[in-house]
Amino acid sequence: MRFPAPVEAVLRDAGWAAGRRVPEVAARVIRTVCAYTAGDGSRHTPFPAAERALTEFAGVYVDQDGPGVALRRAPFAIDPTMAVPTAATLAAFGRVLGVRLFPLGVEGTDDAILAIDERGRVFALDPAGEWHLGDDLDAALTTLITGTEPPRVADDGTWSPAP
């Protein structure tokens, strides 16, 4: 089973299904995001891990609010057009990690930026810090939907498993 049953149920309610592919939507949102140039000249550049994630999950909006395993479960959207002006922020965090990042969407009401790196790892960036949501999108979605506490990324770009 790809996702725990409760996670899969939430994703299905949000419009996802096993085998879902929306390449036209993914291409459109990638074009929109890549058209933006930050004041410092930073731009979003797609890569295969981002393209794969968006081909399957672009346009999935999870409407949830309530207690989770460790944290409150917040709504989130896999829609990078909601995080267009994040090129400079993601470029700076990417330099810390030593990889490129691409926006996936947002958590809450623009409370956090969701981003994927070239290796497929997913992160949340909010005013309190950066968080490793999972080594792949499936793990990150499970973290977000269950309200599991993710590990915080240290200033040197490393993290330890959450307590």
Give names to the regions the model predicted.
Residues 1-111, 158-163:
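A surface-exposed partner-binding patch
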